[in-house]
């Protein structure tokens, strides 16, 4: 029998499953190399942890790793039901909250290595977490895609740690009782982008679709379709970073000015940015602040005679 030790948390309603023991050894390379090894040689462990019957399509997994730099707090590899993520904002907040719950860190600034670079997380005295993300930028403005059954949809392509297609003029109602329609709409947009080979820089797959609308209690409300076709319950840390990059590029948000981003279920992140290297008009360095709550400590058991020990593959 195999055992996987986990800490579950949620950040604004979006769950994170932190793996703290039981996965195969991935060597001493950087997080990008370890992610490659996990995907190529040990992907069954991701599936066992995230897929049904032990997980769900809503879960984001976070494998806790020893960092390359001994001055860093931790390394982490993020994954979900469809594969691997470069960075995850809500997951980083969940990681920090879980490490604090375990007594491994206290309030202060902590460096975390990810497959797309190092981020800086601050655990505040009130329990909230700020994540100083990897640089974000808008790659292309108002790109149009013809979506079968919908028509022409225009949006910005931006990087916030993952690739996003950000749409404001969509005509959809962003509400918790309209999730099926929102999912169908964003899935169709994502499929059209893929079919028409519309991609991020260097051919990066656009695997997140983000819709925006007004919100009475925040600067904006969003609906984010994640890889694997689940929607983000949180306001999405990397998605908010991509949004800040677009606002900065359009001159609609000043450096240091707060931006309150609400999710489709009403949870909120606060975002701010500064220009990378102090150069206006280029990439930004976004900081996202939110809160996570630990919901479980558990050990997943993978019995030798369990036909679904390694997940239900569809």
Swiss-Prot record:
Top-rank lineage group of the source organism: Bacteria
Molecular function via GO: 4-hydroxyproline epimerase activity
Protein residues bound to substrate: 89-90, 208, 232, 237-238
Active site: 88, 236
UniProt keywords, alphabetically: Isomerase
Reaction equation(s) it catalyzes: trans-4-hydroxy-L-proline = cis-4-hydroxy-D-proline
Conditions for induction: Is up-regulated when the bacterium is grown on t4LHyp or t3LHyp as sole carbon source.
Consequence of substituting residue 60 to G/F: Loss of catalytic activity
EC number, as in UniProt: 5.1.1.8
Effect of residue 236 to S: Loss of catalytic activity
Protein's UniProt keywords contain Membrane: no
InterPro entries: Pro_racemase_fam
Subunit structure: Homodimer.
Other information: This enzyme does not require pyridoxal phosphate (PLP) as a cofactor.
Protein name, entry field: 4-hydroxyproline 2-epimerase
Organism expressing this protein natively: Pseudomonas aeruginosa (strain ATCC 15692 / DSM 22644 / CIP 104116 / JCM 14847 / LMG 12228 / 1C / PRS 101 / PAO1)
